[in-house]
């Protein structure tokens, strides 16, 4: 019986390891993320254009960004890329429990980021910074808002994957899905690092 279990586990691991080869799902995801990159490049261009036209102080009064709040939230999001990758490694080993554990942690870290961003929005709006208040308000909420929507989309993907892996036997298709979700999550993390640098340090 032990031999049968070992053989079964080896077979699953072997099938999962075959996912290291390029497949159409992964390639399609990379192509789609490339188009998303162009979208965010447009947002960056819009931001710098608004900055050049505004002149003077940027952000304009009364807007004051809270760097001490933004840094911890950003660090948590960056760390979530590492926990996400640990989940991928578990999936490649055929370790469903490891995958779920690391992806739950990643989900919670992503949720923390979204809640932190919502809290910052609340503070800025309470001090008069809104979309119609200034050009800065428009580009700030547009850029960070679209990124926040992408993070939320990633959280939904994590929920879908966790439910899917909990309702059926772990398969190579599910491992592929976990890898695709990780591509997306790493993408939104990298975009945020760029946004964070531009918004909080390049003025």
Swiss-Prot record:
One of its GO terms (cellular component) is plasma membrane. It is found in: Cell membrane. It catalyses: 4 Fe(II)-[cytochrome c] + O2 + 8 H(+)(in) = 4 Fe(III)-[cytochrome c] + 2 H2O + 4 H(+)(out). PANTHER family: CYTOCHROME BO(3) UBIQUINOL OXIDASE SUBUNIT 3, CYTOCHROME C OXIDASE SUBUNIT III. Disulfide bonds: none annotated. This is Probable cytochrome c oxidase subunit 3. Belongs to the cytochrome c oxidase subunit 3 family. It comes from the Bacteria. The chain crosses the membrane at residues 30-50, 71-91, 96-116, 143-163, 179-199. It comes from Mycobacterium tuberculosis (strain ATCC 25618 / H37Rv). The modification N-acetylthreonine is found at residue 2. It is a multi-pass membrane protein. Keywords: Acetylation, Cell membrane, Membrane, Translocase, Transmembrane, Transmembrane helix. Its main location: membrane. One of its GO terms (biological process) is aerobic respiration. Its EC number is 7.1.1.9. It holds the Pfam family COX3. The keyword ATP-binding does not apply.
């Amino acid at each position: 019986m032990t031999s049968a279990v070992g053989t079964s586990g080896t077979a699953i691991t072997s099938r999962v390891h075959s996912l290291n080869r390029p497949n159409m799902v992964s390639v399609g995801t990379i192509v789609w993320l490339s188009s998303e990159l162009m979208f965010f490049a447009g947002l960056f261009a819009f931001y710098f254009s608004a900055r050049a036209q505004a002149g003077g102080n940027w952000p304009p009064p009364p807007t004051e960004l809270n760097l001490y709040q933004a840094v911890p939230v950003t660090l948590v999001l960056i760390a979530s890329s590492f926990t996400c990758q640990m989940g991928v490694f578990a999936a490649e080993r055929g370790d469903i429990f490891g995958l779920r554990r690391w992806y739950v942690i990643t989900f919670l870290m992503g949720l923390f980021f979204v809640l932190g961003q919502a809290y910052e929005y609340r503070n800025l709006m309470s001090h008069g910074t809104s979309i119609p208040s200034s050009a800065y308000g428009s580009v700030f909420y547009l850029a960070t808002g679209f990124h926040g929507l992408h993070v939320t989309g990633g959280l939904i993907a994590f929920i879908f994957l966790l439910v899917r892996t909990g309702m059926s036997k772990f398969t190579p298709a599910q491992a592929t899905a976990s890898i695709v979700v990780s591509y997306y999550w790493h993408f939104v993390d990298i975009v945020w690092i760029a946004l964070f640098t531009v918004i909080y340090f390049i003025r």
